[in-house]
């Protein structure tokens, strides 16, 4: 939701973001890597095919509690009693790590009860690797960057809270070492285009009585730079980068003067280019030129200290919805009177860096009862301030505040199938009883703690606890601040022959404006293994 952006400013942003795409993440897992020097052998596409069958049931007194519902790639439900039977067949790229070429594929399907769908195709993808580059086509669950996958509250831009978006994705998924500077610099990144799949769900949820979008298109890109050298004894490293995403094109509908109206948009190659290098404008922008679509992203960093028996990490995730928090500057040198659209002064307004997610992670490498600890702090109240004013003939001052995180005037906001696509502490639209595709709590302060351990070879556990204080949104503020506390206690036991049973209990304690009072239990039974062809 980029605020007013003049052509001069837009060109600067475009150049910077275009250069940034050359420092483009997906996952830091070795499943993608080509192991140079390994013995190759013959490529066998029927080798190392993994299967998993899983059955899950959730039982609650009201809605499913937050941490039984969130960060499950959208495979969850708020209904008090729900469940699914799930089966997957996946051949990972790691199978071909000794080859210059690699091939991976997978299908992951769930048949749920009391979900938003009768059948969920959670994953269906094919991917090919040449050396270090990977081309993927289809729906796939991609992990978060620079955060613990099971203990963090979630990433603010490219999270794991919503269903995967079918896409074509070109990636350098693992850090590639630049063959100069003595192996101290490493790069990874991705570019992707896709299509949202929740069109019918939007129709059902809104009953077409409020805004929705058909055929909504998706674009994401990211790039990370790592400074460090694992070949020498130097335990300190720094990772930093940028994630960006855009919702664009499609057929947005909203009510204007009581009538349902389709808003014209730009799709095709022009729309894809405007999403790649933010440009164009929405039909509703008028004389104040914005960029087309719903554009958002995060500046991210992570400092790592890796010792022999322990590791310490400190990370940050700064979210933005427009240039006011992307660059913290806004041009504010417009003229007056007949020259009110002219750039007459070298004057800029500087925004503060207040909204941020900060986290610390401790890994005890040989720990049993205590293995990993994550502590996070989130602040999202500022959003460039409580004022938004486009310059006029009489008042030349320009302020681009009230950013409205995860919401958008035309599009349904940063959500997919009702779940926000970033951090689940932003209250997802699926909670709304008024059938609006709107995030009603995006201004909050939160503290989050996660710990896990493996007391024995067969048993492991996880505990999450979150405190949140919310102010609603700038457009729809709460009449007073509201609070919520959520926690989860989970244990899993591994039996012989790759059988696993996992039980979890969770509760929410909060006002109805937040999550309400919920308590629930979740039981999951799974069996995994390899097909022997």
Model-predicted regions and their roles:
Residues 50-54, 80-88, 119-123, 165-169, ...:
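Transmembrane beta-barrel architecture of outer-membrane proteins
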Residues 55-63, 91-93, 107-113, 130-132, ...:
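Transmembrane beta-strands of outer-membrane beta-barrel pores
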Residues 143-263:
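Internal, well-ordered domain-core segments that constitute the primary functional module
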Residues 236-242, 252-533:
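Exposed, low-structure sequence patches enriched in small/polar residues
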Residues 1-35, 525, 529-533:
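Bacterial Sec-dependent N-terminal signal peptides
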Residues 98-128, 142-161:
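Surface-exposed loop and membrane-interface regions of Gram-negative outer-membrane beta-barrel proteins
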Residues 34-50, 91-103, 116, 129-133, ...:
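Short loop/turn motifs that connect adjacent beta-strands in outer-membrane beta-barrel proteins
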Residues 32-83, 96-107, 189-193:
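Transmembrane beta-strand segments of Gram-negative outer membrane beta-barrel proteins
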């Amino acid at each position: 939701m980029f605020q007013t952006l003049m052509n001069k400013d837009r060109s600067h942003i475009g150049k910077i973001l275009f250069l940034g795409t050359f420092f483009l993440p997906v996952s830091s897992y070795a499943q993608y890597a080509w192991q140079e020097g390994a013995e190759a052998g013959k490529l066998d596409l029927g080798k190392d095919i993994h299967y998993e069958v899983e059955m899950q049931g959730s039982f609650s007194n009201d809605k499913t509690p937050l941490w039984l519902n969130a960060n499950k790639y959208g495979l969850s439900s708020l209904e008090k009693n729900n469940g699914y039977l799930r089966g997957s067949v996946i051949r990972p790229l790691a199978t071909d790590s000794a080859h210059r070429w690699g091939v991976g594929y997978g299908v992951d399907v769930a048949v749920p009860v009391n979900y938003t769908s009768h059948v969920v195709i959670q994953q269906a993808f094919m991917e090919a690797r040449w050396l270090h580059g990977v081309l993927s086509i289809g729906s796939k669950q991609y992990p978060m960057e620079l955060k613990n996958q099971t203990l963090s509250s979630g990433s603010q831009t490219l999270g794991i809270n919503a269903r995967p978006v079918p896409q074509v994705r070109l990636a350098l998924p693992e850090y590639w070492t630049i063959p100069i500077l003595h192996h101290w610099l490493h790069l990874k990144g991705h570019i992707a285009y896709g299509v949202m799949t929740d069109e019918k769900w939007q129709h059902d949820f809104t009953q077409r009585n409020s805004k929705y979008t058909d055929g909504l298109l998706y674009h994401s890109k990211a790039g990370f730079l790592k400074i460090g050298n694992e070949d020498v004894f130097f335990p300190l490293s720094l990772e930093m980068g940028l994630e960006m995403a855009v919702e664009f094109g499609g057929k947005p509908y909203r009510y204007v003067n009581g009538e349902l109206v389709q808003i014209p948009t730009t799709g095709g190659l022009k729309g894809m280019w405007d999403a790649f290098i933010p440009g164009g404008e929405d039909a509703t922008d008028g004389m104040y030129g914005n960029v087309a679509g719903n554009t958002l992203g995060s500046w991210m960093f992570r400092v790592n200290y890796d010792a022999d028996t322990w590791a310490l990490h400190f990370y940050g995730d700064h979210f933005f919805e427009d240039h006011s928090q992307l660059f913290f500057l806004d041009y504010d040198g417009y003229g007056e009177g007949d020259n009110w659209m002219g750039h007459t002064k070298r004057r800029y307004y500087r925004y503060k860096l207040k909204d941020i997610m900060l986290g610390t992670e401790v890994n005890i490498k040989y720990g049993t009862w205590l293995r990993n600890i994550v502590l996070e702090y989130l602040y999202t109240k500022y959003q460039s301030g409580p004022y938004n004013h486009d310059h006029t003939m009489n008042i030349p001052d320009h302020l681009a505040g009230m950013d409205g995180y995860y919401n958008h005037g035309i599009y349904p906001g940063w959500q997919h199938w009702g779940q926000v696509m970033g951090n689940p502490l932003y209250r997802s639209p699926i909670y709304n009883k008024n059938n609006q595709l709107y995030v009603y709590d995006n201004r909050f302060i939160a503290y989050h703690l996660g710990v896990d351990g493996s007391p024995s070879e067969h048993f492991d556990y996880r505990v999450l606890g979150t405190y949140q204080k919310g102010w609603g949104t700038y457009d729809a503020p709460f009449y007073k601040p509201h609070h919520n506390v959520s926690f989860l206690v989970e244990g899993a036991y591994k039996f012989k022959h790759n059988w696993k049973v996992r039980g979890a209990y969770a509760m929410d304690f909060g006002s109805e404006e937040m999550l309400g009072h919920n308590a629930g239990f979740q039981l999951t039974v799974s069996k995994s293994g390899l097909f022997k062809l």
